[in-house]
């Protein structure tokens, strides 16, 4: 019996000799990193890219000259920059600085308070705003400003443009529009009308019909590009 025991003991020791290094290597491989182990570098979040929009509104006003009102906007994160021409008055420009706010999911909203400088035929300082409220296929949008005319206080005025639209499909919308302006002469303090527009990729086209109850309503043709 003793030779058999010695043989088994020798076999067991040989197996231990072979397996222990492999077991130790596996333990070292699976061991958690120590405090001295190098950590992967943190990846900085990239800055939000700029987004731009360009639009041109062509006004066809009865018994008045036709004119084009262009607007350029640039946004990056919270920052909003904007430039307009022929908005507050003809041959008048304005530049704007704003702060973007946004929130909501089902009922989404955006709001941008702004401060602008007006120069040209009308000169002054103008606090303003832009905002949208969206739910389902409905959207309410509004932009306004109050121009403090620094040349003539009687020229101070509140401007507003508001839309309520329904988009049954992604590329088409229609609805109601109102505006309050002094860019051209009108007998109505607030003009009301209808709108219909469609979009293709980054381009959108909209037709506005103000004062449709009049024999000669005001027509505005708008085209916009976003990139």
Model region roles, listed by residue range:
Residues 47-51, 65:
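Onset of an N-terminal alpha helix
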Residues 22-24, 29, 114, 118, ...:
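Intrinsically disordered, low-complexity segments enriched in small/polar residues
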Residues 1-48, 227:
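Cleavable N-terminal export/targeting peptides
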Residues 50-60, 70-72, 76-88, 107-119, ...:
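Transmembrane beta-strand segments that form the barrel wall of outer-membrane beta-barrel proteins
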Residues 66-77, 92-110, 125-140, 156-168, ...:
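Feature captures outer-membrane beta-barrel proteins of Gram-negative bacteria and organelles
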